[in-house]
Amino acid sequence: MSSSIPRVYSLGNSAMTYLLALRIAQLPSQPKVPSVVLLLNDQKKLNRFLNNDSKIIVKSSNNNKETYHRQFMASCVPPILSNGEIAPIENLIVSDPSSKFITAQLSKYNKSLRPETNILFLNPSLNLLEHLHRYRWRFDEARPNLFMGFTTPVDVGTIHQEFQLSLKVKGRIQFHIAKIDGFPRMSSTGKSASLSLRGDRQKNEKENNAFYKLFREISRLRSGIGSDLVSFDLHVHGFQDLFFTELEKLILESCTEPLLAVYDCVYKKELLKIPGAQDIIKKLISEQLSIIDRSYPSLNTNPNYSVIFDKERIFSLVMRDLEVNGHKRAKLAQSLNQLNQTNINELNGFFVSLGKYKKCNCKWNDILLTLIKGKQFITKQKALDYHYL
């Protein structure tokens, strides 16, 4: 990277938010107080951060001892120039499990987000991206440079006492990133750029965009974070390639996790033994593919579309996942039992939202969405009712 370090603003309450901020701070060209600004929820949280000596602390997952810390700049309001005007945010990384929180915070910083702003949504739900595209940045001329990034694994650690991070992962994290330069249109009207022109533009952006340069530098870091050896392997994709990958993952998860919860399964393999479950899975797949086809007709122009989103292929992937990962716990069912928030709105809720928006059939996904929300409600009611204690 050049000697001019781009300032990066970091927004969100996830372990990945802190981990990525720490890695950016470790770049050799960073000053003692790194050019990273944490955007905290409100003034109260900012005060608590300042009372914590403005530090993010990394603790060992084995003995809870501090292994590393770093001081950061922080704020809870849009940046202000010396003349009192709101300053632009050039680079923003957003990572939080709550889509509602993200949309509310983006509204808060709206005047700082310009067409030249780079915004990376890290491990976002497709529901969030669709909402932002449909309601917030519908027109190209007003839209910032949007990126989406997905990591494997997604769950890298746990946050304790707001500013303490315990890392679960050691080793290499796969980091997949793409510029959202062609979010699928809701109609087949309008011409998209030719593949050759799009390819040339993507190549130029990969070489010159500040985010790509930044993450290439991060992927070259070999130092650990305290005693934890954590590094990123960077993979840069075209938008549709990464979108297809995440859409496929979403279909697989939304066809199994809600059913596992409805049937009170503990392990994924149990779904294979339940009579009629496979028929429901087939109906869900068929409905979801129909919703995608109706909602995003422009995707049909991709030569891989009909192969990737073939009904039989998707069903085979679902069955294989239940067999190969059958020993793993049902995540959504576990969240329900632990009285935690579920991601049902990001799963079947995505297809229900699309289906209702495009006025096409979404009854199977809507039924599952209703069942899980009802189960979540009654589970919490029972936990609060002394008759069940």
UniProtKB/Swiss-Prot annotation:
This is Cytochrome B translational activator CBS2. The keyword ATP-binding does not apply. The lineage of its organism: Eukaryota, Fungi, Dikarya, Ascomycota, Saccharomycotina. One of its GO terms (biological process) is positive regulation of mitochondrial translation. It comes from Saccharomyces cerevisiae (strain ATCC 204508 / S288c). The keyword Mitochondrion applies. SUPFAM superfamilies: 6-phosphogluconate dehydrogenase C-terminal domain-like. One of its GO terms (molecular function) is translation regulator activity. It comes from the Eukaryota. Keywords: Activator, Mitochondrion, Translation regulation. Pfam families: ApbA_C. Its main location: mitochondrion. It is found in: Mitochondrion.
